[in-house]
């Protein structure tokens, strides 16, 4: 019996409660219950504990005035009132053994800790106490007398949620712990402690696969030797790599590798050396014309390569295949394209463009101005086609007709030419000449109004011209067929002096020159002038 009482003190719990006359005016709230508070020797009236010093009767008296007051508010009032209870009454209310009033008087408010059970928050200790209590209850047949059941169900209606959680928490505790233990036992062992599966017993057996693929080839191509380090000494290999990477194809004199120089490996260059049967000079010769093998990023271009590229660009334009094939053999086409876009953003390109524009101005005539053109649009024949397309503006043939005295040999009365040169009086002909009247175009008429000196003077801004004065025979027409001629002649006209201003003699065909030279008597005398060649007049008979 003493062991049972000590068990009750270690695991206190409320088995039943007694609520009596909490509200005497409310019959539905009247309940009778017996409460066992941790010890069978002490029984307390729950109604006396609640009504002492807290005026519960006043709250029950107000209940008829508020018949619709919910149970939640009643529970809230009960919680508020229980929060102000002294410690002894609160311990007695929740099933702990209350201290004796006589011992309290003797101790005069002394320490109550020795009378209290050992309270702890350690879950393992609580579970151990609960399990030990359950084992003792199974062995003892009188355990049911220590925990009497609740005889009235109306108390649960009074304490809707609070009573179930507080007064019956002890009853649900062992059951819940037991159920949790069963759940833990049901879990697999690997979930708590996972085993690392390492070892031959956990490996897959691949012997069958190896037997099946023993006769199959992994790949069809034959193996190739890429490099063999045991053929050449390490020093010679480093010298080869230095010459290959630095583009030094000739044999070096003196110390082969500069002191402190770091030589990087090049698998492509070493493979080329293997293909040449470790002949260094032959491998370097191949690398010189096969730059793709030793290409490691965009290597720095030498000054000679830059000049060759610029010359090739000036000749071939953007045809990088021709530039690489004819000018820059040490670089690939892709490197030429990449260098071109980097070159356009550099100062070297600006200087190249300036020199190219200056060279083009030398071939352009003085009267025209060179327009700013992008060098990207140039082609190899850009300079030659520039002059043929632009050309020099061709002016129409200027024909100046002067009637009156002409500087030609005179004709006598006997129809023989006179030997005396000089102006002769104009003789009226009986019949009009065979030469029709010439209708001058607007440009010719404008030039005819000017004096001969002004008409023969060269225009500013044009190339110097060579005026030629020709005396035509009577039978020869003055102009060619493209000029419109009027059939009606208003008055007869005599042969006139013709001044031909020719800019380019290529416009005059050989057929147009022969009639001037054939079938005409030779000129007896020729007049020489001291004027410059550009202003001299050549007189012909």
From Swiss-Prot:
Domain named ELM2: residues: 194-291
Residue intervals of the SANT domain: 296-348
GO molecular function: DNA binding; histone deacetylase activity; histone deacetylase binding
GO cellular component: cytoplasm; nucleus; protein-containing complex
Repeat in keyword set: no
The keyword Transcription appears for this protein: yes
Cellular location(s): Nucleus
Region of interest: Disordered: 100-119, 131-186, 364-440
Modified residues (Phosphoserine): 11
InterPro entries: ELM2_dom (IPR000949), Homeodomain-like_sf (IPR009057), MIER/MTA (IPR040138), SANT/Myb (IPR001005), SANT_dom (IPR017884)
Keywords per UniProt: DNA-binding, Nucleus, Phosphoprotein, Repressor, Transcription, Transcription regulation
Biased composition regions of type Polar residues, renumbered to the chain: 140-165
Subunit structure: Part of a complex containing at least CDYL, MIER1, MIER2, HDAC1 and HDAC2.
Protein name per UniProt: Mesoderm induction early response protein 2
UniProt organism field: Mus musculus
């Amino acid at each position: 019996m003493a062991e049972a009482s000590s068990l009750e003190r270690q695991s206190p719990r409320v088995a039943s409660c007694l609520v009596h006359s909490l509200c005497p005016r409310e019959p539905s709230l009247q309940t009778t219950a017996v409460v066992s508070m941790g010890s069978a020797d002490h029984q307390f009236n729950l109604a006396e504990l609640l009504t002492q010093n807290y005026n519960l009767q006043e709250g029950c008296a107000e209940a008829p005035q508020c018949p619709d007051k919910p149970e939640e508010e009643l529970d809230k009032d009960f919680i508020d009132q229980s929060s102000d209870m002294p410690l002894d009454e609160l311990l007695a209310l929740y099933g702990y053994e209350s201290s004796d009033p006589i011992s309290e008087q003797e101790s005069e408010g002394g320490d109550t800790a020795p009378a209290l059970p050992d309270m702890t928050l350690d879950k393992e200790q609580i579970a151990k106490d609960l399990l030990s209590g359950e084992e003792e209850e199974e062995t003892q047949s009188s355990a049911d007398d220590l925990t009497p059941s609740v005889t009235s169900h109306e108390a649960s209606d009074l304490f809707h949620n609070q009573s179930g959680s507080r007064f019956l928490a002890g009853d649900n505790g062992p059951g819940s712990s037991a159920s949790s233990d069963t759940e833990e036992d049901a879990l697999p062992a690997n979930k708590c402690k996972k085993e690392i599966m390492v070892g031959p017993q956990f490996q897959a057996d691949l012997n069958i696969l190896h037997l099946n693929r023993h006769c199959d080839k992994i790949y069809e191509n034959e193996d190739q030797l890429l490099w063999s380090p045991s053929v050449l000494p390490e020093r010679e290999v480093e010298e080869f790599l230095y010459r290959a990477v630095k583009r030094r194809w000739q044999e070096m004199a003196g110390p082969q590798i500069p002191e402190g120089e770091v030589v990087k490996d090049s698998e492509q260059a070493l493979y080329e050396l293997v293909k040449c049967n470790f002949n260094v000079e032959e491998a370097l010769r191949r690398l010189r014309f096969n730059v793709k093998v030793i290409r490691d990023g965009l290597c720095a271009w030498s000054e000679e390569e830059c000049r060759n590229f610029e010359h090739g660009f000036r000749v071939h334009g953007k045809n990088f295949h021709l530039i690489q094939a004819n000018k820059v053999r040490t670089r690939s086409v892709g490197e030429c394209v990449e260098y071109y876009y980097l070159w356009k953003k550099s100062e070297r390109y600006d200087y190249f463009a300036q020199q190219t524009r200056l060279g083009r101005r030398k071939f352009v005539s003085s009267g025209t101005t060179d327009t700013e053109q992008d060098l990207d649009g140039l082609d190899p024949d850009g300079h030659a086609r520039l002059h043929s397309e632009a050309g020099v503006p061709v002016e129409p043939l200027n024909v100046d007709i002067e009637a009156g005295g002409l500087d030609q040999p005179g004709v006598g009365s006997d129809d023989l030419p006179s030997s005396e040169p000089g102006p002769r009086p104009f003789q009226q002909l009986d019949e009009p000449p065979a030469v029709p009247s010439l209708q001058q175009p607007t440009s010719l008429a404008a030039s005819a109004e000017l004096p001969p000196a002004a008409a023969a003077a060269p225009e500013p801004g044009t190339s110097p011209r060579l005026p030629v004065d020709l005396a035509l025979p009577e039978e020869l027409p003055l102009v060619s067929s493209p000029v419109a001629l009027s059939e009606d002649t208003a008055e007869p006209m005599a042969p006139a002096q013709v001044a031909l201003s020719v800019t380019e003699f290529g416009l005059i065909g050989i057929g147009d020159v022969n009639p001037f030279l054939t079938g005409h008597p030779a000129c007896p005398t020729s007049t020489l002038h001291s004027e410059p060649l550009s202003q001299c007049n050549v007189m012909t008979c």
